């Protein structure tokens, strides 16, 4: 999508508003993201990511996509803490003190630009770290599980990659305008009462479990629903009750279940209740995932989302 909504730099023939950065296992603080003030040289040592953010600040009319590869090779809370705080407080990120004698074009502080969209890929093995609730509350976790038929087809003949070119038809600007509209919408769309009903049901099941969702989670679910509504209106369509149920299915899967983990005594009853409720409300994808987690709990006495 970042390429499709990309803007080509005519000088370098690259997508100027897309940056892919692999996260290293040595990212122990924010310097790999935001750089640092060098007191010996009296200048600011920038990074590709900071330069990209500043470019986004200078071009607020188009979206910018920052993609972090294998972002859990290091503790996200350590290197991404300033971003997490700015997302919550909307305050400036301080880069260096105004009292420093800094010979640099880098400003003392930056706002987190509204046209910056951050995505990260995740691998789970013995070399990676799990996400804290603070991170999970601010993200949608999308699990990619290839169909076995696709895996076998790739064994027989390697799947060819799809070449994608920027569309340059105003879609990037339209995407950003839609995102801003969704962020500014503070109420749910008409006809979405079923969403509140399902959310209340999930909340009642989670109550007292230690995995209750916070104010931010509820807000982000509302934004997700409003985004789907806005997209439907863009295409001159309306959302049915079934559509709203599917949206809540996706949000249970992407925002609630990723936080659930533990042994049988901690989450056994909780997952069983969520499985039953998902079946009652026709939350099909969540039901499948919960049952896989229950199966893992049965075989290894412990389960987690990923």
Where are the regions that the model predicts?
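AAA+ P-loop NTPase catalytic core and its hallmark functional loops
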Residues: 1-169
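Alpha-helical lid/collar subdomain of P-loop NTPases
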Residues: 114, 158-306
